[in-house]
Amino acid sequence: MSPTDDWRIGEVIKSATEKQVGFKWNFFVAFGTYVLITIALTVIQELTVGTGDSVAAALVELLVSLIMLPLGIGLGLLGIRRAAGKATPVSTLWEPYSDAIPIIVMFIMMTVLIVAGFFLLVLPGIYLAIAYSFAPYLIIEKKMGAWEALETSRKAITQYWWRYFGLMLLATLLFIVGSIPILIGLVWILPILGIATGEVFTKTFGADDGESLELEVD
């Protein structure tokens, strides 16, 4: 696999805008599921150990974060699959749990490295936070180990770090704009941003060996 940097911000946004048609329903069912589970776990935590400074509360909060980590990655996986022209059933949300152990190991390693980068000069931490963006998806889609995924993501994104950072800034701006009219714009913006990230991933690493499907339209 030879990562490539052959993509442009305008192109991925345009392609994502086209591909969000027929994708929004599954995306928001998955997103709603994520939100409901988050709320449920938060309520359970509050009713059992609370959210104070106790050791028990800290341990439960860490456990909840680790439980939710694969689920959040599943949301991003929907965008990657859509960008690659593959089926995006709501069940995609649960797929990262089959790789939960390497994902958690990767997350711990990534956190240590990013925090160390921030302690050094801040800028290395920012660089790594962006450069490691694709690591969890390389574990799922390319069956890499934790360290291999981190290094592959870092080396690939380094080729176009500023361009990808620009895409993230644009995504933030679009999110803010979409939030202004009582959040209605996010119905389109969130799926577009998810697919746009998936477009970059797919253009960089290629699609996996799964069967490509014709994109459905509303």
Can you say where each PLM-predicted feature lies in the sequence?
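Selective recognition of hydrophobic, aromatic-rich stretches within alpha-helical transmembrane segments
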Residues: P3-T4, D53-A87, T111-E151, S179-E211
